[in-house]
């Protein structure tokens, strides 16, 4: 093979890789089936719509990958979302998580406007990635974080058992 042929072959390979690599990532992000959805209400306010997705369309505690999306029905400051997260971890007896993750969540999460979404998507190994309106915000590589975050809604001990049942489709 002469140098011109080798150069053309390498160039063609690089062009093909640039076209096909993004497809695999976008497939990975969209290859989920809905398990369930629910609306969180507090007193007379609609707070958010929550939707749980898995690859199979059914949820097994601790199994990954999972996608969990909150679509907010009101404006919220990031600090208020983190505060509510900490309160829910305290309800579950996981106060240690507040100290461990609160600052990281404050740096990741933006203020949310009505109609915007905040999503958690986990990798097969359980690594957590957050998205705001499908735009990547950042990752938390601790494999236990995702399970503890999802427990706020999916644990049998959640403060919102009716919402949990709807999310799990039971």
Label each PLM-derived region with a short phrase.
Residues 1-12:
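Bacterial N-terminal signal peptides that target proteins for export
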């Amino acid at each position: 093979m002469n140098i011109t042929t080798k150069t053309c072959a390498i160039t063609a390979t690089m062009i093909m890789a640039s076209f096909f690599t993004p497809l695999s990532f976008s497939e990975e992000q969209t290859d989920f089936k809905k398990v369930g959805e629910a609306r969180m209400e507090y007193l007379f306010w609609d707070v958010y719509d929550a939707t749980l997705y898995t690859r199979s369309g059914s949820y097994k505690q601790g199994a990954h990958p999972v996608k969990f999306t909150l679509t907010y029905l009101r404006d919220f400051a990031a600090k208020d979302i983190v505060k509510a997260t900490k309160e829910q971890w305290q309800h579950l007896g996981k106060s240690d998580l507040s100290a461990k993750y609160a600052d990281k969540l404050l740096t990741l999460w933006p203020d949310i406007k009505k109609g915007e979404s905040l999503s958690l998507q986990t990798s097969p190994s359980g690594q957590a990635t957050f998205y705001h309106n499908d735009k990547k915000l950042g990752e938390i590589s601790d494999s236990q974080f995702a399970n503890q975050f999802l427990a706020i809604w999916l644990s049998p001990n959640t403060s919102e058992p009716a919402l949990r049942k709807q999310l799990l489709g039971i």
